[in-house]
């Protein structure tokens, strides 16, 4: 399978570039990941934090393996509002739960993946607030989703085995599965008694993921002027 992340860059190439970026900055971010996860009762070792972030990197864009997204990249067919992050979050929740055997880790990881393009959604899904992520909104963002490309499951398994040495259970998402899971996660996020703390944790985890995502995209299209200085500073050893 050759799933594209962008025009001119396969998903594997994008993941590889992000993982390379993570290796450069991880010593800066692993301590903060351990600290923020501790606030929600998760005791990460350095190895756990590294494994968690690498899993997020591998899974954050797997929703782009959706048939609708690949047709958009290959044939310029319209996405009609489709958001790949929602499918990616479904994968992240199920795979993280299988790998870590912990509901909180899976829950938080899925939210991070769901929101990793939050700053650029421009009025589509800007937050986890009720008015932003209603069932109607989620359904609208998934109405053109009709499954993923053949080979997606084996791609995910091979990437995680190659990078982390484990073979996870990988679900086969239907539109109904993704819709139900995303709505459930968003409801839980809004109504937990520690929702304020949860926002802080998700925000802290988004920083290294988004940084590596920009770095991975830079390998394809070059630095954007506004982000170039941030990249130069953060990627310094």
From Swiss-Prot:
<comment type="similarity">
    <text>Belongs to the CRISPR-associated nuclease Cas3-HD family.</text>
</comment>
<feature type="domain" description="HD Cas3-type">
    <location>
        <begin position="4"/>
        <end position="215"/>
    </location>
</feature>
<comment type="subunit">
    <text>Monomer.</text>
</comment>
<keyword id="KW-0255">Endonuclease</keyword>
<dbReference type="InterPro" id="IPR006483">
    <property type="entry name" value="CRISPR-assoc_Cas3_HD"/>
</dbReference>
<keyword id="KW-0540">Nuclease</keyword>
<feature type="binding site">
    <location>
        <position position="116"/>
    </location>
    <ligand>
        <name>Mg(2+)</name>
    </ligand>
</feature>
<dbReference type="GO" id="GO:0004519">
    <property type="term" value="F:endonuclease activity"/>
</dbReference>
<dbReference type="Pfam" id="PF18019">
    <property type="entry name" value="Cas3_HD"/>
</dbReference>
<dbReference type="InterPro" id="IPR038257">
    <property type="entry name" value="CRISPR-assoc_Cas3_HD_sf"/>
</dbReference>
<feature type="binding site">
    <location>
        <position position="117"/>
    </location>
    <ligand>
        <name>Mg(2+)</name>
    </ligand>
</feature>
<keyword id="KW-0269">Exonuclease</keyword>
<protein>
    <recommendedName>
        <fullName>CRISPR-associated endonuclease Cas3-HD</fullName>
        <ecNumber>3.1.-.-</ecNumber>
    </recommendedName>
</protein>
<keyword id="KW-0378">Hydrolase</keyword>
<feature type="binding site">
    <location>
        <position position="61"/>
    </location>
    <ligand>
        <name>Mg(2+)</name>
    </ligand>
</feature>
<keyword id="KW-0460">Magnesium</keyword>
<feature type="binding site">
    <location>
        <position position="84"/>
    </location>
    <ligand>
        <name>Mg(2+)</name>
    </ligand>
</feature>
<dbReference type="GO" id="GO:0051607">
    <property type="term" value="P:defense response to virus"/>
</dbReference>
<dbReference type="GO" id="GO:0004527">
    <property type="term" value="F:exonuclease activity"/>
</dbReference>
<keyword id="KW-0479">Metal-binding</keyword>
<dbReference type="GO" id="GO:0046872">
    <property type="term" value="F:metal ion binding"/>
</dbReference>
<keyword id="KW-0051">Antiviral defense</keyword>
<comment type="function">
    <text>CRISPR (clustered regularly interspaced short palindromic repeat), is an adaptive immune system that provides protection against mobile genetic elements (viruses, transposable elements and conjugative plasmids). CRISPR clusters contain sequences complementary to antecedent mobile elements and target invading nucleic acids. CRISPR clusters are transcribed and processed into CRISPR RNA (crRNA). Cas3 plus Cascade participate in CRISPR interference, the third stage of CRISPR immunity. Acts as a ssDNA and ssRNA nuclease, probably with both exo- and endonuclease activities.</text>
</comment>
């Amino acid at each position: 399978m050759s799933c594209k992340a962008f025009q001119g860059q396969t998903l594997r190439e994008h993941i590889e570039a992000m993982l390379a970026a993570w290796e450069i900055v991880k010593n800066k971010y692993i301590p903060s990941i351990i600290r923020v996860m501790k606030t929600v009762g998760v005791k990460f070792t350095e190895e756990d934090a590294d494994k968690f972030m690498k899993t997020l990197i591998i899974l954050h864009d797997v929703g782009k393996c959706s048939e609708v997204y690949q047709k958009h990249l290959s044939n310029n067919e319209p996405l009609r509002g489709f958001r790949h992050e929602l499918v990616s979050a479904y994968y992240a929740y199920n795979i993280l739960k299988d790998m870590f055997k912990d509901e909180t880790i899976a829950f938080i990881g899925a939210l991070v993946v769901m929101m990793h393009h939050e700053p650029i959604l421009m009025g589509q899904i800007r937050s986890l607030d009720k008015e932003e992520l209603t069932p109607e909104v989620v359904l609208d963002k998934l109405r053109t989703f009709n499954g993923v490309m053949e080979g997606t499951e084996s791609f995910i398994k091979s990437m995680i085995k190659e990078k982390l040495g484990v073979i996870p259970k990988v679900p086969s998402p239907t539109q109904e599965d993704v819709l139900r899971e995303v709505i459930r996660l968003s409801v839980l996020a809004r109504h937990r008694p520690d929702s304020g703390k949860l926002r802080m944790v998700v925000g802290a985890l988004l920083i290294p993921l988004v940084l590596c995502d920009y770095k991975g995209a830079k390998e394809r299209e070059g630095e954007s002027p506004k982000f170039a200085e941030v990249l130069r500073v953060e990627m310094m050893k």
